[in-house]
Amino acid sequence: MSSWSNQPAMDDYGLPSSNPYGNFTVVDMAPKDILHMIHPHWYQYPPMNPMMYPLLLIFMLFTGILCLAGNFVTIWVFMNTKSLRTPANLLVVNLAMSDFLMMFTMFPPMMVTCYYHTWTLGPTFCQVYAFLGNLCGCASIWTMVFITFDRYNVIVKGVAGEPLSTKKASLWILTIWVLSITWCIAPFFGWNRYVPEGNLTGCGTDYLSEDILSRSYLYDYSTWVYYLPLLPIYCYVSIIKAVAAHEKGMRDQAKKMGIKSLRNEEAQKTSAECRLAKIAMTTVALWFIAWTPYLLINWVGMFARSYLSPVYTIWGYVFAKANAVYNPIVYAISHPKYRAAMEKKLPCLSCKTESDDVSESASTTTSSAEEKAESA
C-alpha cells in the first residue's frame, strides 16, 4: 500500500500539486488508475479512521460466511425435497440464488479492499463489481414483488384466482432477470456510470455528477427498482383484510354452533397460506430496511452533498449486504416444511419446535393443493 499512499497521486494526472482541501485526503490513498473515476467532492475529506477497515472486514467476513452458507442450504433443501418443489417455491429459490450470487461476487473483493484500505482491483472490475451488486439487488426486490403477488392471488382471490403453474413461475423469473439486466447494464452505455464510493472500498452508481443524463438514470432507476415495488403494500393490506374477515367469520360461526373452533382441513390450508404471507411480508420489510440507506445516500448525494462524507457511504452497502443474510434465516425459522426437510437432511442445523407437527400438517395441505393446481 505504501507505493501509492506516501505521495499525493494527483501530481501524475496534471492536477494541482497542492491539495486545496488539505495535505492528505482519502483520495490520495487510491491507485492512480482509478483517479479519473473519483468525483472532486471526495478530495476535501481526510482518510477514514484506520479502525474502520478491520471492523468492516470482520463484518463482511461474518455476513459473507452466513449468507453463502445459509442461501446454499436453502437452495439445496428446496431443490432436493420433492414436497417443496412447487411453482411458488421456484420464486423462493430464485431469491436465495440472487442473494447467494450477490455475496459470492461482493464478499471477496470487499475483503481485499478493506485489507488495503482502498480500491486496488482496477477500474474495469470496479464497474463489474457495481453492476453485479445492483443486478442481484434488483433481482431480489422484484422476486419479492412476485412472491407477494402470488400470496395475494392465493389468499385474497382464493378459488377465483388462477393457480401459479411452473411455466408461469419460470416466466416471472425470466422477466425478473431481463428487467434487472436491462436497468443495470445502462451505465455501461453512458446513462450514468459506475464509480468508486467515497470510502474507496466499493463501487456503485455516480450520484454526484450534476448532468441531467446521470441524474435522470437515478430518477428512473429509483422509481422502477424502489418506489414501484412498493405496490406490494396494497397487496398486504388486502391480505390482512381477507384474513381478518375470514377469522371473524370462523369465530362467529363457531359461536353460533356452540363449539370452540371450526378448524378443518380447509381452514388449516388458509392458516398455512397466511403464515407464508407473513414470511413474505417480513422478508420484503427487511429488504426495504436494507436498501433504503443506499437510496438515501444517492439522493443526498444529488441534492445535499455537503452532508455526505466517506464514512456515511459505508452504511449504504453495509445494510445492503446484510440483506442477503436475512432471507434464509426467515425461511428456516418460519417455514414448517422447510424445517421438517432440514431436520431430515441436516439434523445438525434443524430448529424444529414442539408445535411444528401441527404446522407441518397444515403446510402439507397447502403444498398438496398447489401440486393439484399445477397438474390441472
From Swiss-Prot:
> Under what name is this protein listed?
Rhodopsin
Q: Which Gene3D superfamilies does the UniProt entry name for this protein?
A: Rhodopsin 7-helix transmembrane proteins
Disulfide partners: C126-C203
Ranges for region Disordered: 353-376
Give the location of motif 'Ionic lock' involved in activated form stabilization in residue numbers: 150-152
One cellular component term (GO) for this entry is: cell projection
Pfam families in the record, alphabetically?
A: 7tm_1
Side Extracellular, residues? 1-52, 113-126, 190-216, 301-311
Protein origin, superkingdom:
Eukaryota
Listed A to Z, the keywords are:
Cell membrane, Cell projection, Chromophore, Disulfide bond, G-protein coupled receptor, Glycoprotein, Membrane, Phosphoprotein, Photoreceptor protein, Receptor, Retinal protein, Sensory transduction, Transducer, Transmembrane, Transmembrane helix, Vision
Membrane spanning residue stretches: 53-77, 90-112, 127-149, 169-189, 217-237, 279-300, 312-333
